[in-house]
A protein has these predicted regions:
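Structural preference for beta-strand elements that scaffold enzyme active sites
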Residues: 2-4, 31-33, 79-83, 123-125, ...
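Active-site-adjacent pocket scaffolds in enzyme catalytic domains
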Residues: 25, 40, 45-72, 125-224, ...
Length: 284
């Protein structure tokens, strides 16, 4: 099985200490893929300090030189991977930036090149803010040769004219009807690939994530834990789950102790040959 971690919202306001505290120990065992906002707009995102929220001012990543230097060093050492997380993330006129916003082709192109030039590393994956994207957003990332760090679906932009859309849709339908949990493989849509993020958040269930993890293990598939550095200390709403960080640590402990698990970056997993769905149920 391939295991990876996706962390969202690194931006101008993020400090190296925050990320080091969150992932200093974890990256001794495998990389963490950071979804980075290139030009953070201070809107409603909780990764933005409360005193700045609602000002709608724009803060380019390069203006936090301490963070940029720390990221460059961490990426060069293989501790982290840079992924593109929207452009501004928050848009005063558009609830979901990449569900139907303006100039999406330009934003994807400019945002990618900005991060690559700034951090000295390739960007292979796009993670839309709020995991929400539309048809134009998917076209934009496909044109740039990027993959999607979540799953979209027919209603969120998969081309109705592509045979791969319907073969993937049918495969997923059969998987779910047979009792399958999560999506333990990479989806290949032809012009781009997608990897499901398994949420590790205050509202997620450790029991459910462990079931998805077990299913991916049985299939020799993929498991991507998706979280936010800024909420690792927040308690989970489900009993016996502890904090978000504790839930993540439980999954990490399993991944690092099992010799059958290959811990890779999101970009490495999604860029490799896609894992095809297997017939039948995932045994409980």
């Amino acid at each position: 099985m391939h295991f990876c971690i996706r962390d969202d919202d690194t931006n101008f306001f993020t400090t190296p200490d925050e990320l080091e505290h969150a992932y200093g120990e974890i990256t001794k065992f495998g990389p963490v893929s950071l979804a980075i906002i290139p030009f953070c707009r201070a809107g409603t995102n909780k990764a933005v300090p409360e005193k700045w929220r609602g000002r709608w001012s724009v803060h380019p990543l390069h203006e936090n030189q301490a963070l940029v230097s720390w990221l460059r060093a961490g990426i060069a050492k293989g501790r982290f991977e840079a992924m593109l997380h929207g452009y501004h993330h928050d848009d005063e006129q558009q609830e979901w930036e990449f569900a139907g916003g303006k100039d999406l082709f330009q934003k994807v192109s400019d945002g990618r090149r900005y991060l690559e030039d700034l951090l000295g590393a390739p960007v292979r994956v796009f993670v839309p803010p709020h995991n929400t994207i539309g048809r134009q957003g998917l076209k934009a990332i496909a044109r740039e040769g990027l993959h999607l760090g979540c799953t979209a679906g027919v209603r969120s932009g998969w081309s109705p004219l592509s045979p791969m859309t319907w073969s993937t849709w049918l495969r997923l339908r059969k998987w779910r009807s047979s009792g399958g949990v999560g999506i333990p493989w990479v989806l290949d849509l032809g012009d781009h690939r997608e990897i499901a993020g398994n949420p590790v958040t205050p509202s997620s269930s450790l029991q459910e994530n462990e079931a998805r993890y077990e299913c991916a293990m049985q299939m020799g598939g993929v498991f991507c834990a998706a979280t936010h550095y800024w909420e690792l200390n927040v308690p989970c709403i489900h009993s016996n789950s502890g904090t978000v960080g504790r839930q993540l640590q439980s999954l990490v402990a399993r991944a690092k102790s099992d010799p059958q698990v290959m811990w890779r970056s999101v970009g490495d997993v999604i860029s490799a040959e896609p894992f095809l769905a297997q017939e039948g149920e995932c045994a409980p």
